[in-house]
Amino acid sequence: MAYKVLVVDDSQFFQVRLKQIINEHPDLEVVGIAANGQEAIDLEESLRPDIISMDYEMPHLDGISAVRSILSKRPIPIVMFSSMTYEGATITLEALDAGAVDFIPKNFAEVSRDSVVLKKRLHEKLLLFAQKAKPSVAARSTTQPSGVRPSALGANLSSSRSPRPASSAPSAPKKRIKGLVKLVAIGASTGGPVAVSEIITRLPANFPVPVIVAQHMPENFTKAFSERLNRQSAVEVREAQDGDLLKSGVVYVAPGGNQLMVDKTGRSIRILDGDARLTYKPSVDVLFASAASAMGDKVLAIVLTGMGADGCDGAKLLKQKGATIWGQDKDSCVVYGMPAAVAKAGLTDEVLPLDQVWQRLVSDV
């Protein structure tokens, strides 16, 4: 039995191509197509799909309004299919705030030319998040995405971005770092925008060290992400630029499509063109490796939710220099991939639930 997918897009071209691409996977089946948000609401009620692919700019009712309406009735994973423009990025982040679980960049050229990369990305994400909607199907499917935590996904689907109390008190620190840390470096991928926001928006304006975030996002998205975080946070948040001086209480978001490195002096940031040999731009490994070289044991590295193992190689270098490494725990991750890789390699000093990460940053750094 395949997962049931509802495709929502006002373009007939994208409707046809997305249906073709999605149906190529044996564990996915498009059961309906909606041309606007209102049709999406109606079809969701009648077809009861397991997951929805949602455009954002449509007549009659836009994607964000549809996301809010649908999620007010039941928790279903919704993946946004988003324009690569700055405007598209801004709206996509609003959709994530509204409860969408993730996004896929909407690239006409990739869809037109039958891109293998797009197919892989689309299939992986739809399968990954549909697993929460109908775990009984996951048990019978021919291909199961690994690492997804239904509990974490369910929380993401049902929670708002408003502040909420921590579920438990912070655990006792295993390694004393108060006054020793001079840089916090955070790496994240799938599920990261919400997780990073949960941490950064809780930091006080006088946070004593600079923070660098490498979040897997395309160009334009990181600019919109940093601006949105800046509006929501007490600390200053900015998209990093080449030559930026590292200042306490400032959060620097690595720009999409590029690599961010800490300068060898440990005082500033270098932004380099994305290396075609590297899958991720920005890469958590590149950030961690440069931080290890420049600042050694003065770094606190945090690996958050995400697919794959980006950050593990960089964490090894950090560990060799005596740096402190925290990993997000399995239950609070949307995808337990990157933190799992670091934990399995024996590199984490502590494994923490997401709601304890910001508390420990405030109390321990």
Curated annotation (Swiss-Prot):
Its EC number is 3.1.1.61, 3.5.1.44. Phosphorylated by CheA. Phosphorylation of the N-terminal regulatory domain activates the methylesterase activity. GO terms for biological process: chemotaxis. It is found in: Cytoplasm. Residues 138-173 are annotated as: Disordered. SMART domains: REC. Keywords: Chemotaxis, Cytoplasm, Hydrolase, Phosphoprotein. GO terms for cellular component: cytoplasm. Disulfide bonds: none annotated. The active site is at S189, H216, D310. The modification 4-aspartylphosphate is found at D55. It comes from the Bacteria. The keyword Kinase does not apply. Residues 4-121 form the Response regulatory domain. The keyword 4Fe-4S does not apply. SUPFAM superfamilies: CheY-like, Methylesterase CheB, C-terminal domain. Its main location: cytoplasm. GO terms for molecular function: phosphorelay response regulator activity; protein-glutamate methylesterase activity; protein-glutamine glutaminase activity. Residues 182-365 form the CheB-type methylesterase domain. Residues 158-172 have a biased composition (Low complexity). Belongs to the CheB family. Contains a C-terminal catalytic domain, and an N-terminal region which modulates catalytic activity. PANTHER family: PROTEIN-GLUTAMATE METHYLESTERASE/PROTEIN-GLUTAMINE GLUTAMINASE (PTHR42872), PROTEIN-GLUTAMATE METHYLESTERASE_PROTEIN-GLUTAMINE GLUTAMINASE 1 (PTHR42872:SF3). This is Protein-glutamate methylesterase/protein-glutamine glutaminase 1. It comes from Saccharophagus degradans (strain 2-40 / ATCC 43961 / DSM 17024). The lineage of its organism: Bacteria, Pseudomonadati, Pseudomonadota, Gammaproteobacteria, Cellvibrionales. The gene is cheB1.
